[in-house]
Amino acid sequence: MILIIAEKPNVARKIAGALSERRPIKKSLFGVPYYEIFREGKKLIVASAVGHLYGLAPKRDVFGYPIFDIEWVPVYIAEKGKEYAREYIKALSVLAKRVREFIVACDYDTEGEVIGYTALKYACGVDPRVAKRMKFSALTKRDLLNAWRNLEPTINFGMANAGIARHILDWYWGVNLSRALTHAIKKASGKWVVLSTGRVQGPTLKFLVEREREIQSFVPRPYWVIKLIFEKNGQKFTANYEKDKIWEEEEGKRIVLEVKKSIPRVSNVEIKRQKRTPPHPFDLGTLQREAYSAFGFSPKKTLDIAQSLYEKGFSSYPRTESQKLPRNINFRMIIQNLAKMPQYRPYAHILLGLPELKPVEGKKEDPAHPAIYPTGEIPRPGDLTKDEEKLYDMIVRRFLAVFMEPAIRESVKVTIRAGPHKFFLSGGRTVKKGWLSVYGKYVKFEEVTLPEFFIGERIKVIQVKREKKKTKPPARYSPAAVIKKMEDLGLGTKATRAQILETLYQRGYIEGKKSIKVTPLGMKVIETLEKYVPEIISVELTREFEKKMELIMEGRLTKEEVIEEAKERLTKILEEFKKRELEIGIELAKIVVGEDEVKPLVVGKCPKCGGDLIVKYNKKTGKRFVGCSNWPKCDVTYPILQRGEIIPTNKTCCNGAPVVIIREEDGREFEICLDINCKDWKAKSH
């Protein structure tokens, strides 16, 4: 018997339906559905994970940071709210004992490979090297049968290792840096406030903060524009002055006066025709930007809808960077099926009449998947939600457009001379629709048809207009623009960028769904980290590790090498952080808990003057000690251990010195008198 492991239950159902030579037998185990099917004389079990079944967690409870000793555990242990995964793990464990062969049929990308790898190793209890791999980019019967007939001999260990490394690095960065920020605030204010950052979150927030600073520091500058309003054939037209900005008001007045005294005439008419080639097929980033422009969908919403269309079998796998459509996709068959839908029939018939279907392609490639395309499976009424209908329409029209003829646009530029000055009037129209006939609803071309102008023609002026304006600050990023910027900077992956943006919203670092504004909290976090530990938010460091993950995938680096290097780099960063922990905590606590709450840790009363004994830090060495709040009038100080959390006890010992509890990073606690001459001091200080 063979066990096929899908990524999600509805994908398991699709695979069972495609591969079974009879009607699939649906069964359940611990309430989890699975399917028994027969193919080519073999009995197959098709079961599923439910996304990630395993996550990372510390091997032991440790208080503090850094922490690097982690392991894979069931996801319901690693994360809250994932209890539903327990039954899926149990089901796979039982089913694995009934079979001799394993096939992974999760999504073919790094995340899918990690899901398959961990399910095999931990739930099924087998060596992942024994499993074969179904590789597909769409959930149609023909694609799934093709994947079955062309099984890969193993899972893609390059992808699996890169995915595992990414998970570990993200855990190291996210958990350790978040603990560091939280501990810093606790040290400064005595309050536990969870604050987080991450390997990609930090650099992403940084470029948003940089834009916010540009906007805040922007000083508007006045300028003037000059327009020539005239009439021709009963219509009004507005021509713009040759300089788009006049910086001096007096110059603007002079130009207006000179134009009014002149007799404006047409000095040139320039007509150009340009071919506009069809757009390239959709990669995920382009789809997210177009869907935001057309429908206002956030990048995450677009990805979620595209994933749903994929799982329903209507479009191909969405997490792709490819802008190419390989020839092994049966374009003609897909278009023949799309022709059954009235809204696409006219365009499909045009394409079916061509001797060859050759798509326009972009430059970007993806080794795992082609560009996004409709599968040719036709949705029935009720199959799609309203938002799914919108995105499906965009995907279909884009697919049809890439095979169509170029559009031809005509642009007209009329030059009007008024004395020594020039004005320009521009128009543009589509003279041959080509691909715009099918995709034009998603493309913004201005259609401005001008009447015929002749050189030397006198212009009937209505008004010479001078308008005062002010320069505007840079625009805030839209969600789609953030995804594009992350792509350009090499931050995150096609699959993670949308979620990183959502996380920044959830953390309270940014706000505004269309125009993203960084909150005071987001500004303060970046300002503080820039000041004390800038490497935490380094775009270069993040990009460097992204490239190393690609090298793991290509087999040119091992995951162990990259994980070890990341550990070393992060250890150094956290060492610097600890030296400035109190200062960082004070800065952050001012905005997180309020300035009034930022107070030093008081461990007792001074036996000499009655002042507060507080934890202080040496500015040169960064080492902590206890001193009197009335310094320099009172010079009482005590040394204190440099490790562990200090907890006051309200008790005293030798000569009125306070007794404190030191809580070690492993959770152990012990009491110590702060007087260095106390008989217990030396024993406890080692």
Curated annotation (Swiss-Prot):
**InterPro entries in alphabetical order:** Topo_IA, Topo_IA_2, Topo_IA_AS, Topo_IA_cen, Topo_IA_cen_sub1, Topo_IA_cen_sub2, Topo_IA_cen_sub3, Topo_IA_core_domain
For the keyword Magnesium, the answer is yes
Q: Topo IA-type catalytic domain spans which residues? A: 156-574
Q: Where is this region: Interaction with DNA?
A: 196-201
SMART domains (alphabetical): TOP1Ac (SM00437), TOP1Bc (SM00436), TOPRIM (SM00493)
Q: Superkingdom of this entry's organism?
A: Archaea
Query: What does the record give as the reaction this protein catalyses?
Result: ATP-independent breakage of single-stranded DNA, followed by passage and rejoining
Q: Does the keyword Magnesium apply?
A: yes
UniProt KW keywords: DNA-binding, Isomerase, Magnesium, Metal-binding, Repeat, Topoisomerase, Zinc, Zinc-finger
Q: Which SUPFAM superfamilies does this UniProt record tie to the protein?
A: Prokaryotic type I DNA topoisomerase
Q: State where the C4-type zinc fingers lie.
A: 606-634, 653-678
Q: Which cofactor does it need?
A: Mg(2+)
Quaternary structure? Monomer.
Protein name stated in the entry: DNA topoisomerase 1
Q: Which organism is it from?
A: Pyrococcus horikoshii (strain ATCC 700860 / DSM 12428 / JCM 9974 / NBRC 100139 / OT-3)
